[in-house]
Amino acid sequence: MEYSAEDISPVRKKVVITTEPQEVEASIMGTIALYKTSVQVDGFRKGKVPASVIEQRFRDKIYEEARQDLINVHINDVMQKLDVMPLAGLDVDTPDAFERGKGFAYTIEFEVLPTFDLPPYEGMDVEQEKVVVDEKEVQEVLDRILRDRAQLVPVEGKGPAVDGQIATVDFAAFENGEPVEGVKAESFDLALGERQALEDFEALVKTIPYGEEGEGEIHFPEDFIAKDLAGKTVTMKVKVHAIKERKLPALDDELAKSLGLESVEKLKEAITKSYTESRTGLNRSAAQKSLLDGLLKMVAFELPPSLVETQMNTLLADMAGRLERQGRSLESLGKSMEDLRKDMQPQADELARAQVLLLSVAKKEGLDVTDHEVTTQIYQLAMRTGEDFKALREQYERSGMIFVLRDRMLADKAMDLIYAKANVKEVEPKAPETGAEADAAPGASASAQESK
């Protein structure tokens, strides 16, 4: 095998590979030998089928597998000799026929990391906020646990219901006197004041006493997830069957034991531990970002288009996921995909720059991600999402996402190395935490059970 390489651009290479007839012959014969051990042909015992019969019966498959195997061997060999790591899938052009007695020439093109001088990344100074968890935060989680385990009891009187209470209602929507499909329910428990429903709907429910009916105009916002309702105003008819309030359980050791812990004190410790671990990770990530931002200010290089596109697709997928959890969609933003991509371009470029820098550090430091590490990561993802591990692994391989995952894991290792070699100075938190982090605290009770 001979090859010649050229740089098409600072981030793209082209390699022409020429194979001698002997290599083609050896690859075909090797594939036939593998077939001989596994295929069955009528009239022959398994493993005793002549090579000529096997080649005649399975010629197309054998030649294609032999061709691909030879290309894979060559690519691995060339990458090692060139000391490069493709960033995405390879474009392979094979104009020559693959057959006995002839050589085989083909071309591969692929993107690579740009070459640039790495800035000094060892011994950098960075500040990291200390972790502080106060009693108020712990109490907020305890209050939420009590609220989630509360009993619903009827309130005295006819109401109407107010914020903090739960109204059990029947409702149905009408437009021009006709029922609106899909907007109807019976014995629906609506917790008032918790933004579970449209403001107009909650306001209507708060005007109707227990046992009575009422109706009013309800306006659906323009970005409502159900496209057929977005922007419409309908007549909502409501009947209130019951008005209830929560009766909180006692905060005692029995409650703690129902959560898998010995006592209230152990429950508080588990909540504090959960907050501490979460906040430590957040503070560490903030310090790492500060280190990375400092390094990126010192370098300039061309960005590989495929890397930018990968970051763009990730950003769009993340945004779509966030909107879906809010009951919305990308279309609800009122922007075309072209406009969304334009808005996100600076962020995608910056993420790609960070990836290039970190992968370059990983290469210099000789860092690597093993197949076992990649497999473990995919397995953990399958466990979180409930997907079949084997199917998910095959999906990653078919789509080429396995290379994206490998590069991300490698970049993470490089970031961890830079952080480990930095001079980290702990400082007091700049400001008290807002309620945003507390929104994640329902998971704290689960973490509490896991930490027993």
Curated annotation (Swiss-Prot):
It catalyses: [protein]-peptidylproline (omega=180) = [protein]-peptidylproline (omega=0). Keywords: Cell cycle, Cell division, Chaperone, Cytoplasm, Isomerase, Rotamase. It is found in: Cytoplasm. SUPFAM superfamilies: FKBP-like, Triger factor/SurA peptide-binding domain-like, Trigger factor ribosome-binding domain. Pfam families: FKBP_C, Trigger_C, Trigger_N. GO terms for biological process: 'de novo' cotranslational protein folding; cell division; chaperone-mediated protein folding; protein transport; protein unfolding. GO terms for molecular function: peptidyl-prolyl cis-trans isomerase activity; protein folding chaperone; ribosome binding. Its EC number is 5.2.1.8. Residues 426-452 are annotated as: Disordered. Residues 164-249 form the PPIase FKBP-type domain. NCBIfam families: tig (TIGR00115). Consists of 3 domains; the N-terminus binds the ribosome, the middle domain has PPIase activity, while the C-terminus has intrinsic chaperone activity on its own. Belongs to the FKBP-type PPIase family. Tig subfamily. This is Trigger factor.
